[in-house]
Amino acid sequence: MKGVSAAFTAPAGLSIITTTFAEGPARNKALSVYTATGATGFSLGLVFGGLLTEIGWRWVFFLPAPVALVALLAGIRLVPQSARPRFSRAFDIPGAVTMTGAMLLLVFTLVEAPAVGWTSGRTLGSLVGVAAILGAFVWRERNTSAPLVRLGILRSGSLVRANLAAMTLFGSWVGFQFVVTLYLQQLRGWSSLETGLAIFPGGFLVAILSPRIAPLIMRFGVTRLIVAGMTLITAGYVLFLPIGLDSSYAFAMLPTFVLAGLGFALAFGPLNVAATNGVAPGEQGLAGGLLNTSFQFGGALVLAVVTAVLNANVGSDGSPQALLDGFHAALIVSVGAGLLGVIAMTQRPVRQVQAQPELEEAFEEAA
């Protein structure tokens, strides 16, 4: 239920911003505030989530319900109504089923591969199945009058690079946070609250700095900010690699969370700008949906790889050092994902979107 709800609300929220504010300083500022509010919620969630688990884990799922109700009522009251479309559009159920099926099968295959073997018939057959389902999705989108994803939008170099960077940015962080949580709670014996407080500085920096990123977007452009942000985040992961069984928080962990906070503040807002600049108003929801799908799929994909690497490298004796060795190997996955994001953003687009006359100029501004 939460996943379906997020699939409806996240792209809609981004679309409301991009269709309400014109490209340029106003939209950049709005997206910076959007990033800051998300980071604030993330930071507070770490702390309050830890507190609530001290009462009982069910409270972690119950408390968001009244908060969501208040947000819904506020949205009905404050968000301006958009004009209804002049024509109704069919929903592409086959496209949604094939795309979702391909992503689920890929993640499942990566999770199960260490147990059944990377070259086993089951693993190879599943990968062939992923390719076949993706082929069916592309065929469907090319041959239906109401596609889930208009494939022509992928001619936008800025949008494609932003989505690749989103996958690696969020994926690397999800994988890193997974390993850090296991490290702190299993090896160091920290509570959920202590773990949340340990990670809190990163989210706090994002919440404080994100509203101030808009002027930097106008001065340096989104590509440079995204590359700088992802470089800082990846450097933070590298600093965490030598972590030991008794490493101090202040010197061995805090620098990573500070760099991650600075990096997210620099990269997240510009990613939203790069993914939506130059897109026609009627496709802002599609662009937002693609970006949020990239965030979520990247998180699931990298986490699956992290889990596979962790399980493959944990020693059989179950000693603390054996667990630590597995954590070190898994952290390399996040480093690699971060580097891939930097590489993706430094590649120049081959083609630009041709659906609207003004798009070429818009994408040059985004770069």
Descriptions of predicted regions:
Residues 82-88, 113-119, 246-247:
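Membrane-interface helix caps and helix-loop-helix hairpins in membrane proteins
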Residues 85, 347-367:
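Intrinsic disorder in cytosolic terminal tails and internal cytosolic loops
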Residues 1-94, 281, 285:
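Helix-loop-helix hairpins in multi-pass membrane proteins, especially solute transporters
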Residues 65-84, 100-112, 129-144, 341-349:
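C-terminal membrane-cytosol helix-exit motif in multi-pass small-molecule transporters
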Residues 13, 121-129, 133, 139-317, ...:
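12-transmembrane solute porter fold
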